[in-house]
Amino acid sequence: DRYLEPEHPGARKHLSRLAESTGVAIADIDGLKHALCVALDHFQACGCVVADHGLSCLRGGADEVREQLLLFLGEEYRRRGMVMQLHLGPIRDQSPRLLETVGHDAGGDSVGATSDPAALGHFLAKLESGGGLPRVILYNLNPAESAVFSTMAVNFAPQVQYGAAWWFNDTLRGINAQLDELMETGLLAHSAGMLTDSRSFTSFPRHEYYRRILCAKLGKLVDGG
């Protein structure tokens, strides 16, 4: 994601490191695309099958460069048989004091509004009408947007799936709400299931937590006839 935000304070440093690691000179967007392809080839050779994007929002207009790069990456993922995950909705680093004291990704993030729903549909439609959709999994952080994401996934099924309850929603109430949304607007059989942050070994129990909630819900439905 750092390569999709040229306005980010650390963008120049990140681009320099990408150029160094790939051996590709990055002087324009074509150079950036080439470097990203080289990096993708490396990850694919190491067995990578999933890519993940965490974005505050998805909209057109001022974000045309980012959209162009996302569309390009989506096509590359499809060509390589990789899954494209879109985690949408957080607003980052809200407290200047906390950011200055402990840095990024340290508790200063909050729930935001993802996007104009039409922008999300427009993005997926562009991918579909271009080279074709890769497999896409959508995750919303704002629970008020669950119906937007679940119905959008149905629009582009089976390539697009509605992902598991994420972050602040990864709770008893949040997981139940996500499952209800999935069953009401789509099919439970189309669930992508639970996922785990591989960087955090303490997150692995969430699979058991999810399984118990899912089994309790199914048992209640069966018991109720």
State the predicted function of each range.
Residues D1, P6-A19:
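N-terminal hydrophobic targeting/anchoring segments and the immediately downstream early-domain regions
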Residues D1-L4, G54-L58, G89-D93, L141-P143, ...:
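Active-site beta-loop-alpha junctions enriched in small/polar residues
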Residues K13-R135, A144-Q159, A177-G193, R211-L214, ...:
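Histidine/acidic residue-rich metal-binding segments in metalloenzymes
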Residues G107-G112, W166-T171, F201, P205:
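Short, contiguous acidic/charged loop-to-helix segments that flank catalytic cores in large enzymes
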Residues L141-A144, Y162-L179, G225:
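C-terminal helical cap
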Residues G163-A164, M194-T196:
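Active-site neighborhood of phospho(di)ester-bond hydrolases with catalytic His/Asp-centered motifs
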Residues R199, R206, R212-I213:
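Shared catalytic-loop signature of beta/alpha-barrel
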Residues L218, G224-G225:
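A conserved C-terminal secondary-structure "cap"
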